[in-house]
Amino acid sequence: MIDKRDDKPFKLKSKYKPSGDQPQAIESLVDNIEGGEKAQILLGATGTGKTYTMSQVISKVNKPTLVIAHNKTLAGQLYGEFKEFFPDNAVEYFVSYYDYYQPEAYVPSSDTYIEKDSSVNDEIDKLRHSATSSLLERNDVIVVASVSCIYGLGSPKEYADSAVSLRPGQEISRDTLLNQLVDIQFERNDIDFQRGCFRVRGDVVEVFPASRDEHAFRVEFFGDEIDRICEIESLTGKTIGEVDHLVLFPATHFVTNDEHMEQSIAKIQAELAEQLQLFESEGKLLEAQRLRQRTEYDIEMLREMGYTSGVENYSRHMDGRLPGEPPYTLLDFFPEDFLIMIDESHMTMGQIKGMYNGDQARKQMLVDYGFRLPSALDNRPLRREEFESHVHQIVYVSATPGEYEMSQTNTIIEQIIRPTGLLDPEIDVRPSMGQMDDLLGEINQRVARDERTFITTLTKKMAEDLTDYLKEMGVKVKYMHSDIKTLERTEIIRDLRLGVFDVLIGINLLREGIDVPEVSLVAILDADKEGFLRNERGLIQTIGRAARNVDGHVIMYADKMTDSMQRAIDETARRREIQIAYNKAHGIVPQTIKKDIRGLISISKTSHNDISKEEMDYESMSRGERKEAINALQKQMQEAAELLDFELAAQMRDLILELKLMD
């Protein structure tokens, strides 16, 4: 039995006090949530402290909260911030646990079957287990997740029902406990004691939960009764303290009991017989043979081990769902009355909408050619309307909310005053005729003041031509294109901030990590060419890149004024007017954001006599040296993850993959 703690409130700790229009935004959001409003939008300009506002709202409404970001990097940043704001509450991190993932696929044109290949990050797997166990044990939980939270996860009821509950004085034999641990996918390992394992020494059983990485538990028996339970350091075995109640959750999220397993296997066999009959009637003998061989092997593994590689493809049968029914996801682990916050909602909601179709197209091919049973199609992400059915109350957070969010609610709460007093930039519209010379003059003014410039173009050719022209004119310039690798991208941004070069040219400068306070000029070429990066939302986001410097200025080069341009200019002017009035009324002088310049990722290179840290030229390395570099990077990646620096860990991961591809 799980005793759920529901009496502990969220306790926000921060040296900041709400300022600007944060108090009004916080009050409005809280009042609307407590008044039962289902959906609302927090329209927060860049740099206005949206995460702090979100934290204030969570602490006041006191509901379990799911915060969804559109990629791992942003989720990692938010997780770090929420951990600082709520040190005494359960702040959890739930993203895809794959460092590398090649999904199972089949390409009929070349008759190529691509097996599923993946590398699981043990640290993230631990954090996922920590998230689900926290949700079942307590209410003061914030889970920061990527869109992987809408993928199938296994039944929360089975997960909770399978949990092993232990107390001192409880009558249970040692062997019964060992059998229960094996049933929930724990492995016995008396030598290498790690997550998801247990070891036995006489009347003492030591268990290492899947949600921990340093502390394990020691269960001491006296006959067929538990004498005491202690929390211990997993490495030294040193006792930390005694425990009154221990709940051990399964070591995998896909778990079922023996009775359900036999029922599931019977359903899998029935579906297999049906699909084999279909293939044989259509003369697809190869597909039939392939399907029989694969499925019968999986059934044998399920019978003997209770698990098989790719068990999630049978999740419909394991969960007892009907064909087409949505899978269980992280959202099902939350209680009914929970709060969802969608960060950068204009990006995240688009991802939630698109996940289902891509997944189905790939899996349908596997089903058609006999690699999987049709029920594998039900191991999938949620459709958007299925996601909506889980929503009790939701806050969309964005500087530029999308059409979907706007269609869901008329309640829009603005937050456009920055704590630093910074204003949205002034905008000039200039003709494209003579734009090169005009731009050169503007760049030279910034160089003289030791400031930087962003230039965004629409085509690769335009970017390359402009780069060549500016180089000929003596400007220190770089072009950041889509082929630039992760580490190079970080290096380019760092060099721009340090003044190694003064101008950065790109097509899409809206991605995360491109906020540079030293940038005082953003030039938008072809501003009148309507499209993804020149619509109102794209323009406002691009304009925001100049909002971190007190001298921020935007120039749009265009031959006509489009509706998108006019709306973006009007919105920026409206915000600027409000910001100026606020600063004047409160005597605030705007100041450029101060942001530390982070060092480059470096790795240790071993020489015969010493170890020196230096930047590496990977291209010129031998295969053996590259292998050493990969090992060193993997170690540093783990260290970064343990320190909760997921942005750095993600960069390490991408670099490791690039190095592996060189061989």
UniProtKB/Swiss-Prot annotation:
GO molecular function: ATP binding; ATP hydrolysis activity; DNA binding; excinuclease ABC activity
Motif (Beta-hairpin): 97-120
GO biological process: nucleotide-excision repair; SOS response
Subcellular location(s) per record: Cytoplasm
A Pfam match: UvrB
InterPro entries: Helicase/UvrB_N (IPR006935), Helicase_ATP-bd (IPR014001), Helicase_C-like (IPR001650), P-loop_NTPase (IPR027417), UVR_dom (IPR001943), UVR_dom_sf (IPR036876), UvrB (IPR004807), UvrB_inter (IPR041471)
Residues given in the record as ATP binding sites: G44, A45, T46, G47, T48, G49, K50, T51
Domain Helicase ATP-binding, residue spans: 31-418
Key words of the record: ATP-binding, Cytoplasm, DNA damage, DNA excision, DNA repair, Excision nuclease, Nucleotide-binding, SOS response
Region (Disordered), start-end ranges: 1-23
Cellular component terms (Gene Ontology): cytoplasm; excinuclease repair complex
Composition-biased stretches (Basic and acidic residues): 1-10
Domain Helicase C-terminal: 435-601
Main localization category: cytoplasm
PROSITE patterns: HELICASE_ATP_BIND_1, HELICASE_CTER, UVR
Record-annotated UVR domain positions: 627-662
Family: Belongs to the UvrB family.
Primary role: The UvrABC repair system catalyzes the recognition and processing of DNA lesions. A damage recognition complex composed of 2 UvrA and 2 UvrB subunits scans DNA for abnormalities. Upon binding of the UvrA(2)B(2) complex to a putative damaged site, the DNA wraps around one UvrB monomer. DNA wrap is dependent on ATP binding by UvrB and probably causes local melting of the DNA helix, facilitating insertion of UvrB beta-hairpin between the DNA strands. Then UvrB probes one DNA strand for the presence of a lesion.
Assembly and interaction partners: Forms a heterotetramer with UvrA during the search for lesions. Interacts with UvrC in an incision complex.
Domains as described in the record: The beta-hairpin motif is involved in DNA binding.
Protein name: UvrABC system protein B
Organism ancestry: Bacteria, Bacillati, Bacillota, Bacilli, Lactobacillales
